[in-house]
Amino acid sequence: VQVTILSSNLANGATIGEWGFSALVEVDGNCILFDAGRYPDTVIKNAKVLNVDLSCVTDVVLSHFHFDHNDGLLPLIQTLHDQTAAEIRRIHVAEGFFSPRRPVINPGTFPTCMDGELECNLMIGLREEIASEGVEFIVHSKAAEIFPSVWISGPVERHHPEINYPTGTSASKLEVQLAGDWVDDFIPESQALVIRTQNGPIVLLGCGHS
């Protein structure tokens, strides 16, 4: 098992840091990209500096809809398809990933709701454009084994009334539409990637909202 961090808020001078996350996961010849970072070129540039070959990637797992985990997805797919032999075929998301979001407090402070935008989930609008690259979105309602010994958790049942948004006078707050009702956005689609090894499971999280 090899896990290489390609986007985070840490950098060593040669790599680029950002408010975002992405990791390449290599397991028994299978390559999975877990999240895609915030900016279009971060993952590509860091992979080059680290001598990481992204042409092996066939599957992407997105932990949740937030911009710092997937804004770089479409340009990344386009670049890999144009410049490498990569054939990204599937994107795995959990149920709730494409649910509408709306701002209810300080909408201008949430980056994807700027300029009066009422829909804060930009992945809804990008879904068809990404699919036009020949990539299939697979929406999971429960845990699934996507490769031998590689699992995604799917949506995680919540047992406690969590607050998954900042609090304070300047903080933003979103609601999510589920079954026709608007409720506080608890990020229902937040999921993990789990790798089973002889020494126990390896668990990768995005923000760990669930």
Predicted regions and their residues:
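Active-site metal-binding motif and surrounding structural segment of the metallo-beta-lactamase
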Residues: 41-93
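Short glycine-rich or small-residue beta-strand-to-loop segments that form or flank ligand, phosphate
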Residues: 33, 59-63, 94, 202-205
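Hydrophobic alpha-helical segments and helix pairs
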Residues: 84, 88-140
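Active-site environment of divalent metal-dependent phosphoester hydrolases
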Residues: 41, 66-70, 98-100, 144-145, ...
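Short acidic low-complexity segments
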Residues: 53, 137-146
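Active-site metal-binding loops of divalent metal-dependent hydrolases
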Residues: 8-10, 36-38, 65, 95-97, ...
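Conserved beta-strand hairpin/beta-sheet module of binuclear metal-dependent hydrolase folds
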Residues: 2-50, 186, 190-209
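Active-site-proximal loop/helix segment associated with metal-binding centers of metalloenzymes
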Residues: 105-124, 142-197
